Structures are given as structure tokens and as C-alpha cells.
Curated annotation (Swiss-Prot):
Catalyzes oxygen-dependent 5-hydroxyuridine (ho5U) modification at position 34 in tRNAs. Keywords: Oxidoreductase, tRNA processing. GO terms for biological process: tRNA modification. Pfam families: Rhodanese (PF00581), UPF0176_N (PF17773). This is tRNA uridine(34) hydroxylase. GO terms for molecular function: oxidoreductase activity, acting on paired donors, with incorporation or reduction of molecular oxygen. Residues 123-217 form the Rhodanese domain. Belongs to the TrhO family. NCBIfam families: PRK00142.1-4. CDD domains: RHOD_YceA. It catalyses: uridine(34) in tRNA + AH2 + O2 = 5-hydroxyuridine(34) in tRNA + A + H2O.
């Protein structure tokens, strides 16, 4: 049975003093041995973390006791292994970066559509269905008949809208993303641009996969996630994709057979994009990873500090032994 609980959460809320939350939140996560990253900004909180069920329950309870963070939106999935290496709480300008000033989902946002009602909506021929995620995410899975804006980052989405969507022509627009947060901003942006009927999938793809049976589903493929699982299938279990440690792109087993694929160094997606300096750096990093594995040690993450401390203590013990031996020799002279 999977014993690691993965929790994706977010909430748009005015947090004028969000900086003061960082240290107590980080301390709470470290004490509970929760790993992953949470983002704090004046507009709210966002992130994905993982830990035991008790630890995640404690985190959600802690957040619920903070002014403004009550009833936070979250989705749970499960894994056999910890999908994160480190524990981080970062301070940001935005909890999801669109880069457009004045977009506030707290003031205006699209109409939420529950997973149970989503199929009927997107089956309407008058509805334009747009995937708000990045191209590499769309490539491994999306909803049937969804439009791929072919963006590399969410910052490019406003330009896609300006060039391809027209409020006078596209009367009904439905959008979706992984957990719902990008759609909060994308629907708010469309409403600001004059689109009247704008809908988005409440809880995102992950909530849809959780609540809709596969035989009734209009989802095709797997869903990319921003952790070491890379992607999840319809049962929210780790999917078939791996990840290139050089460019972080999802890769298939077939792509790993390519001559362009070198573990930790390159893949078909990045072989022509990385410089010789980067390649050398990636080769050295992979060498260090393999060396750590041979010693059964962590290469990155919070466990590295334990490894370093253990080595320091071992060296100190050897130094003390050497000092004692020298003292013994001098005493016998």
C-alpha cells in the first residue's frame, strides 16, 4: 500500500503580510518531515508537498488555523516513494505567474464546473475547449478535442488569447489545468478581455481523474505533475513517463533508447539545445549521483546534511584517534 501522501493545494486570498508566514510554515513542515515546495505571495498560497498521512493532516490543520487560509483547496494522491528531495517555502510576487498586472481572481473569475458536469459542457459543439497548460504537459495527455495553445510558459498564454480568441466570435470558452490554479487566472483574464461565458474545471484534471470513472472519462493519456512521479495515470498512480534530468522534460522508454539519450546528461528534447559547458556540468553531476548511490547516500535533499554531518563526525573521530596515538607514543619515549 502506498504510504506517501502527495498534497497539491492553493488558495487565492489577500495576504498583505505573507512574508511573516514563511518561517513558521517552514518550521512546521520540517518538524513534520514534509517535503516539497509551497509558494507565498500577497495573492495567496500554492504548491505541492508530500509526507505521511498524519503529517499532511497536521499541515492542513495548521493552515486552517491561519487567518485567511481556512478551507484551503487541496487534492490528495499517493505514491510508494517520496517524490520530493527538499522542503521549501518561497516568497513570490505571484503564486502562479501570468505576468499581467491587475488580474485578480478574487474580484472576477470564470464559472466553476464540477467534474460530474464537465463532460456535458465540453461535448457542447458551441464550446471552445482550451488547455491552459504548457506544450510539454499537453503532449502526454489532454481532454478529447482540446486546443493546445503550444505555450512554453504560462506567461505566453495572454498572447495566445489575443492572437487566437475573439469575444465576438467565441461565445463559450471552457478551460482546464492540472489542479485548477492556472484556470483561476486564465478565466479572470478572459473575463477582463470581454469574454462573457467562461468556464473552468473545478479542482482541475486531478480532481476529474479522482471522481470520474475511466469508462466514462473524456481524458486521453496521462497527466503531467511537477514532482518526481513525472505523470500520473487515470487512477492517479505513477505513469509510464520518466524525466530527463538535464532539461526536465518527460520522456518515454522508447525515447530513452535514442542515441541522444544519456542518463542525466541529454535526451532527444535537449541534445541540440545544451552547450558543451552544460554537458560537462551534467556529466559531473551524474558522476556524483552514481557515487552517492554506490555509498548508499543521498546526493541532494535534506538527507545530504545528515550525510555531511556523519562524515564530519567520522573524520573528527579519526582525528581524535590519531591524537591519542601520538600522545601514547610520546608517553613511551
Amino acid at each position: 500500500m502506498s504510504n506517501v501522501v502527495v498534497c497539491a493545494l492553493y488558495k487565492f486570498v489577500s495576504l498583505p503580510h505573507f512574508e511573516s508566514l514563511r518561517e513558521p510554515l517552514l518550521s512546521m513542515m520540517e518538524q513534520a518531515e514534509i517535503k516539497g515546495t509551497l509558494l507565498l505571495a500577497s495573492e495567496g498560497i500554492n504548491g505541492t508537498v508530500a509526507g505521511t498521512q498524519a503529517a499532511i493532516d497536521a499541515l492542513l490543520a495548521w493552515l486552517n488555523n491561519q487567518n485567511g487560509l481556512e478551507n484551503i483547496v487541496y487534492k490528495l494522491s499517493f505514491d510508494d516513494e517520496m517524490p520530493f528531495y527538499r522542503t521549501k517555502v518561497k516568497l513570490k510576487k505571484e503564486i502562479v505567474t501570468m505576468g499581467v498586472e491587475g488580474i485578480d481572481p478574487l474580484k472576477v473569475v470564470g464559472t466553476y464546473v464540477k467534474p460530474q458536469d464537465w463532460n456535458a459542457l465540453i461535448s457542447d459543439p458551441e464550446v471552445i475547449l482550451v488547455d491552459t497548460r504548457n506544450d510539454y504537459e499537453v503532449q502526454i495527455g489532454t481532454f478529447k478535442n482540446a486546443i493546445n495553445p503550444v505555450t512554453e510558459t504560462f506567461r505566453e498564454f495572454p498572447d495566445y488569447v489575443k492572437q487566437n480568441l475573439d469575444p465576438a466570435k467565441h461565445k463559450k470558452v471552457a478551460m482546464f489545468c492540472t489542479g485548477g490554479i492556472r484556470c483561476e487566472k486564465s478565466t479572470a483574464y478572459l473575463k477582463e478581455q470581454g469574454f462573457e461565458e467562461v468556464y473552468h474545471l473545478e479542482g482541475g484534471i486531478l480532481k476529474y481523474l479522482e471522481e470520474i470513472k475511466q469508462e466514462e472519462s473524456l481524458w486521453e493519456g496521462e497527466c503531467f505533475v511537477f514532482d518526481n512521479r513525472v505523470a500520473v495515470d487515470h487512477d492517479l498512480k505513477k505513469g509510464q513517463y520518466d524525466q530527463c534530468n538535464a532539461c526536465r522534460m518527460p520522456i518515454t522508454e522508447a525515447e530513452k533508447l535514442s542515441l541522444a539519450y544519456v542518463q542525466g546528461v541529454s535526451c532527444p528534447h535537449c541534445i541540440d539545445k545544451i552547450s558543451e559547458e552544460q554537458r560537462k556540468r551534467f556529466v559531473e553531476r551524474e558522476r556524483q549521483v552514481n557515487l552517492a548511490k554506490s555509498r548508499n547516500e543521498a546526493h541532494i535533499g535534506s538527507d545530504v546534511n545528515q550525510v555531511i554531518e556523519a562524515r564530519r563526525q567520522k573524520k573528527e573521530a579519526l582525528r581524535q584517534q590519531s591524537v591519542e596515538k601520538n600522545k601514547a607514543k610520546q608517553a613511551n619515549v
